[in-house]
A protein has these predicted regions:
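A short acidic, leucine-rich amphipathic alpha-helix
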Residues: 42-48, 59
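Short capping segments at the starts of secondary-structure elements
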Residues: 21, 34-39
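Short, Lys/Arg-enriched N-terminal segment that forms or immediately precedes the first helix
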Residues: 5-17
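Pre-recognition alpha-helix immediately N-terminal to the DNA-recognition helix
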Residues: 26-31
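Long C-terminal interaction/binding lobes of large macromolecular proteins
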Residues: 32-33, 46
């Protein structure tokens, strides 16, 4: 039942993004929401196993449409752009050793206070921010 709800939501997401709900695009959306901060290439490689004729352009176009509508966020990281389905205020915890990225809402109150203070002190209206905190994840710090 939960899978049917997810599929219905993915189909709605595609429609709202102005895209036809094809099996290939559904697979792209499913993969983006299943993985943790994937790159377009990672999504492409996984979806291509199910749909060998899918083009990389389909993946990029689908991701671009989802990004433009605010359903996912592009995160440029050095050599690759990753996609984050968590578009709410949060920090990205980036492991320096394995590269894993985790979302953390632990400091959301501080982020909101910072945005409020900036607007109050400068008349600048922040619309978004990106906070990346680098260190070692629990797995790497335990090794």
């Amino acid at each position: 039942m939960a899978e049917q709800v997810a599929e219905t939501n993915y189909m709605s997401l595609l429609r709202e993004a102005g895209l036809r709900s094809t099996p290939q695009r559904l697979a792209v959306v499913r993969e983006v929401f299943r993985r943790n901060h994937p790159t377009a290439s990672e999504v492409f490689e996984t979806v291509r196993q199910q749909f060998p004729t899918i083009g990389l352009a389909t993946v990029y176009n689908t991701l671009r449409s989802l990004t433009e509508r605010g359903y996912v966020r592009e995160l440029p990281f050095g050599d690759a752009t990753r996609f984050d389905v968590n578009v709410t205020t949060h920090a990205n915890l980036v492991c320096n050793q394995c590269g894993r990225i985790e979302d953390s809402s632990a400091a959301n109150d501080l982020l909101e206070a910072m945005r409020s203070r900036i607007q109050q002190d400068t008349s600048f209206r922040p619309e978004s921010q990106r906070v990346d905190i680098y260190g070692l994840c629990s797995t790497c710090s335990a090794s």
